[in-house]
Amino acid sequence: SSAASDVYKRQEYMRRALEVAEKGRGRVRPNPLVGCILVKNGKVIAEGWHDHLGGLHAEQMAIHDAEEKGHNTNGAIAYITLEPCNHFGRTPPCTEALLWAGINEVIVAHGDPNPLVRGNGISVLEQAGIKVRSGLLEKEAAEQMREFLHWCQNRRPYVTVKIATDSTGSVDDLSLEAQRFTSDECLERVHQLRKDSCAILVGANTVIRDDPQLTVRLVQTARQPLRVIIDPNNRVSPSAKLLNDGNPVQHLTENFRGLPALLDMLGDMEIQRLVIEGGPTTINYFLEDGLVDEFIPVSYTHLRAHETGRNL
């Protein structure tokens, strides 16, 4: 039926909006990923996404894209992954841009998670006579903005624990003196995970034993994550790489006040995702406090240090 094919088409358009939103990953925080598709007479005439902090919002970029291509946006339908903002932040409100462009219908995947503005953008559009529907592919949008939504609700980062497993799948005993290396593909995944996080946390033992860099080097990144070292007894050497490479670091010594306070502090710094790369001791502290949101297994292969010469 044509109603069913309409629903299917609408989902396809929203899927495309979610797809283009991904182009901003790692570049827009603390803002969420947002994508916008403009459709007119059954054809996609423009697309936009929030590309970098302080840059155009998705709706503004899509409208600009339509103009560049010589398309008239009057009477177009906008598919947007997140409810358009109605306040002046780093840029003017997107609701105004949509009104100005003559969009006559807006389809939204997910409402604004901020309770102060939730529903605001939608009601402003409706008052101006624009037809608004929301909730199309809402689950997919929520998954895409998972860390952002978690931070909005809890004012704390989403905590991911990286578990190192050996070739048999058992958890690596990180207390072994052996240097740990991974396959190239696996290393790249580790670096991608770092890029997608705002902060990386380790305990003193990991720093003392491995002297890691914990930076993103194998994939392109706009900025390095904050490295957090929990070291209440101040055992880490002042010459550790982490403390001397000029990248952001928080070395918590006698000022460490426990994990809940640490997560609150990181939340205040607008850190939305924290990856734990520490050993079993550090991971257990997080588990005991019930503070882990997700586990990611990374399989390590044991090689002797002279066979490959790289550190993490």
Predicted segment positions?
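Residue-level signal for inorganic ion chemistry
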Residues: 17, 35, 85, 125, ...
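Short beta-strand scaffold segments in enzyme catalytic cores
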Residues: 34-39, 163
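Short, flexible loop segments at boundaries between secondary-structure elements
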Residues: 227-236, 296-304, 310
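Short, basic/aromatic recognition patches
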Residues: 13-27
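Conserved small/polar residues in nucleotide/adenosyl-binding loops
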Residues: 3-11, 301-308
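Active-site ligand-binding patch in enzyme domains
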Residues: 150-152, 156-273, 280-284
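Residues at the N-termini of beta-strands
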Residues: 105-106, 199, 273, 294
